Amino acid sequence: MGSVRETQLRWAILGFLLLQAASETPSQFSTEAMTLSSSTVADHLPSSPGPTWSQSQKHTSGLSADVPSSGRSSDSMSGDTSHNVTSTSPNMSFRTTADSTVPPSPTSETVLTVAAFGVISFIAILVVVVIVLVSVVSLRFKCRKNKESEDPQKPGSSGLSESGSTANGEKESITLISMKNINMNNSKGCPSAEKVL
């Protein structure tokens, strides 16, 4: 049982190293490198239940020929794994990591979604700009109307201020008169207060 796990671990390490080599130099990734590295692992493979060496070699050689050059989608790769149900888990993990390195091609649906989002955001920005411009223009007209309505009233407003000042003057004169009356009343009672004033 331990030898099966060791074999799986070796396959996982081999797959990881091959994946790194493929990502660093994809042009040098070929079937020769795959068969050379897999032949070194073949010496250590025990006779255990599962796929034979020829099946796994066929499986990996098909993988090395398809991954870097053909750019097939992940659906075609997963179709291969459904045919080979008895393949070992390191091969499966290598396939999933190889599939994750291939970027998905944009479909027309995603392109349309992005375009629709762009158009909607552009319209929203235009609406906000129009609202700001309308509010600025309306505030300017209101300010002009207020200035125009104040301009004819300026002589009248000075008249209002004069009438206000005369009203204030009347209040002061009333206050002075009442103070005189108080002083006169006090002076009648007290002759020295009259001399002070």
Swiss-Prot record:
Modified residues (Phosphoserine): S187
The keyword Membrane appears for this protein: yes
Protein name: Endothelial cell-specific chemotaxis regulator
One cellular-component annotation, GO: plasma membrane
Disordered as annotated region, ranges: 40-107, 146-172, 178-197
Biased composition (Polar residues): 50-63, 83-107, 155-168, 178-189
Low complexity compositional bias, start-end: 64-82
Extracellular side, ranges: 24-113
Main subcellular localisation: membrane
All ranges on the Cytoplasmic side of the membrane: 135-197
Post-translational modification: May be heavily O-glycosylated.
Species of the source: Bos taurus
Subcellular location: Cell membrane; Cytoplasm
Transmembrane segments: 114-134
Function: Regulates endothelial chemotaxis and tube formation. Has a role in angiogenesis and apoptosis via modulation of the actin cytoskeleton and facilitation of proteasomal degradation of the apoptosis inhibitors BIRC3/IAP1 and BIRC2/IAP2.
A family per Pfam: ECSCR
